[in-house]
């Protein structure tokens, strides 16, 4: 500050004034891009908002907006929530932590903690069980990382703890050979369909039974018409949030989003005397839930280039194989299983190139590509140019197999942006899950 003494105000003889000296930072030492910034529009809480997709992403987003005073409706072709990849009735909140520093590790930790608090209400209403999740290492490298994680997250000692063989057997209730693991006492499993039904009923969110196959911008008021397969307008949305997983690519404004349709099969099998002793979820190469009404669930497969909706016997074997590769003692839990006691279900995840979700405003691909074309020549060039985005259009998708972990976090991000609230996360995390991130990256690498 530049401080000076001048004539005082009123009866005061003198007073001190100060003027802030803004030091301009050289753009060559601190490159800056504002591609993530969009022009803000005035939002009235009473406006009707519509969400495409009634899975965990769409339902949590609807609730986050309803809590902020918006009128929200969900459009889903099934006419009910908790379908498609969100039809998993024994879904695990899978912990994913890293010994590395940076925004990715921070994002996973923040999202996981937010999810833990978010789902307490559902566990209290018997929509799952907060039985704890035991994470077992699948390699010597992971075993070493577990010790490093314990050191790195000492301030999070109540969130998880490093446990030895004796503790593992006590916590899990079964005999295992593995020497160490990480135990997350506040995590567990949930029935995603029941969670979706519970929150949409509690917050009185209407479900419109229509198959939305197209959207179009109404330029006179920047609203969006939503069409069915007959090109009939279903609704006119003042604001529209697309939350239909990999199917975002079927809509023209979001067709550029790089989302892969990835098949996953879950195996369900009848419990036996030994497996009934399992008290918590165990995660390693795959996962295994405790007996729920005499049924265990384990999984899940990651089938690339396989779009079959039929249950595959080979995938059941693969899921059992994942358990045994984690610890040979799992053989005691799955031996002598009759094929008639095995069932399962198939779902299709929507995954991104970097395995992080898309959450935020939908960029105008052509305008962004033109506006930031200079990045092809100089990837480090700084600019004050803000991004080009479609008005009143948002996307929440690409959570892969971590829908339960990421959904509450992404829902809050989108609801905050629509409400013109300040984001509650570090800037770099916001950029890492921003829908425009691949446009900027691909321009810098001359891919587009």
Which residues are covered by each model-predicted region?
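Dinucleotide-binding Rossmann-like beta1-alpha1 core, especially the glycine-rich loop
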Residues: 90-172
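Glycine-rich FAD pyrophosphate-binding loop
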Residues: 67-87
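Active-site lid/adjacent beta-loop-alpha segment flanking the redox-cofactor pocket in flavoenzymes
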Residues: 97, 274-385, 389-391
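A conserved short coil-to-beta-strand element within the FAD-binding core of flavoproteins
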Residues: 208-224
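C-terminal catalytic lobe of FAD-dependent flavoproteins
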Residues: 9, 336-448
């Amino acid at each position: 500050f530049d401080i000076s003494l001048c004539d005082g105000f009123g009866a005061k003889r003198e007073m001190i004034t100060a003027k802030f000296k803004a030091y301009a930072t050289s753009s060559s030492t601190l490159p800056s891009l504002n591609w993530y910034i969009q022009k803000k529009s005035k939002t009235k809480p009473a406006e009707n908002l519509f969400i495409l997709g009634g899975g965990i992403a769409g339902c949590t987003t609807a609730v986050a907006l309803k809590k902020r005073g918006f009128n929200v409706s969900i459009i889903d072709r099934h006419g009910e929530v908790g379908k498609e990849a969100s039809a998993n009735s024994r879904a695990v909140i899978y912990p994913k932590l890293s010994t590395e520093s940076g925004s990715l590790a921070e994002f996973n930790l923040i999202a996981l903690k937010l999810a833990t608090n978010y789902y307490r209400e559902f566990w209290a209403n018997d929509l799952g069980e907060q039985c704890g999740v035991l994470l077992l290492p699948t390699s010597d490298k992971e075993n070493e990382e577990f010790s490093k994680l314990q050191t790195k997250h000492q301030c999070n000692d109540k969130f998880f703890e490093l446990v030895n063989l004796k503790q593992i057997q006590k916590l899990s209730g079964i005999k295992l050979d593995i020497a160490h693991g990480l135990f997350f006492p506040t995590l567990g499993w949930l029935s995603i369909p029941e969670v979706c039904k519970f929150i949409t009923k509690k917050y009185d969110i209407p479900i419109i039974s229509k198959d939305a196959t197209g959207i179009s911008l109404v330029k006179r008021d920047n609203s969006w018409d939503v069409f069915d397969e007959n090109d009939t307008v279903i609704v006119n949305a003042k604001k529209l949030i697309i939350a239909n997983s990999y199917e975002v690519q079927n809509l023209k404004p979001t067709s550029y989003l790089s989302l892969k349709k990835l098949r996953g099969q879950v195996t369900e099998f009848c419990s036996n005397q030994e497996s009934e002793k399992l008290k918590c979820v165990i995660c390693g190469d795959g996962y295994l839930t405790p007996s729920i009404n005499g049924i265990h669930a384990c999984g899940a497969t990651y089938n690339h280039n396989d779009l079959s909706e039929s249950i595959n016997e080979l995938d059941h074997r693969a899921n059992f194989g994942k358990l045994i590769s984690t610890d040979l003692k799992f053989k005691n839990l799955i031996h002598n299983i009759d094929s008639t006691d095995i069932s399962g279900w198939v779902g299709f995840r929507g995954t991104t190139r970097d395995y992080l979700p898309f959450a935020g405003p939908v960029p105008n691909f052509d305008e962004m590509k033109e506006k930031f074309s200079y990045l092809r020549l100089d990837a480090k060039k700084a600019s004050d140019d803000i991004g080009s985005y479609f008005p009143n259009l948002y996307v929440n998708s690409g959570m892969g197999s971590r829908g339960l972990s990421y959904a509450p976090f992404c829902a809050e991000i989108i609801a905050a942006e629509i409400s013109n609230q300040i984001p509650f996360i570090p800037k770099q995390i916001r950029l890492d899950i921003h829908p425009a991130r691949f446009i900027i990256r691909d321009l810098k690498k001359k891919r587009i």
